Amino acid sequence: MNRLKEKYNKEIAPALMTKFNYDSVMQVPKIEKIVINMGVGDAVQNAKAIDSAVEELTFIAGQKPVVTRAKKSIAGFRLREGMPIGAKVTLRGERMYDFLDKLISVSLPRVRDFRGVSKKSFDGRGNYTLGIKEQLIFPEIDYDKVTKVRGMDIVIVTTANTDEEARELLTQVGMPFQK
């Protein structure tokens, strides 16, 4: 069993239960899934860009991402409907906990001038979104093989009903929020 999942079951869930006075164990918020999305805007001109993004996301997440395609044509962006414009991967279960553990303990401390993640990135429904400016913070990415520095969005979806519950859950997991 993953270190983070073990910690959740033994320490975090009982602590949340006492703090929020839940009647049942099933009411305790837990992390449902993590979605990593990488938008590749230059894939419109350069078809090879999407391949490198897919490869990098595979290394980061440990599973093959889905190529996202344009829903509508937008003439201003020279975009046609159905063109590949990004890649996303949804992590659940064991891989999700592995990724979150790696993100908190290894990758985030490698960000330049890191002072913690924003407390304001909750969506009102208990989900947390985190933007990363460069993929180089992940140890799986080889610096020499990177053609272009790309950012990504990481969405942590929880079963929490409010932002306060989700914030407490992520704080207990070890997410380094700004003071």
UniProtKB/Swiss-Prot annotation:
GO terms for biological process: translation. It comes from the Bacteria. Gene3D superfamilies: 3.30.1440.10. GO terms for cellular component: cytosolic large ribosomal subunit. GO terms for molecular function: RNA binding; rRNA binding; structural constituent of ribosome; tRNA binding. Belongs to the universal ribosomal protein uL5 family. This is one of the proteins that bind and probably mediate the attachment of the 5S RNA into the large ribosomal subunit, where it forms part of the central protuberance. In the 70S ribosome it contacts protein S13 of the 30S subunit (bridge B1b), connecting the 2 subunits; this bridge is implicated in subunit movement. Contacts the P site tRNA; the 5S rRNA and some of its associated proteins might help stabilize positioning of ribosome-bound tRNAs. Part of the 50S ribosomal subunit. Part of the 5S rRNA/L5/L18/L25 subcomplex. Contacts the 5S rRNA and the P site tRNA. Forms a bridge to the 30S subunit in the 70S ribosome. Interacts with VmlR. In stalled ribosomes contacts MutS2. This is Large ribosomal subunit protein uL5. The lineage of its organism: Bacteria, Bacillati, Bacillota, Bacilli, Bacillales.
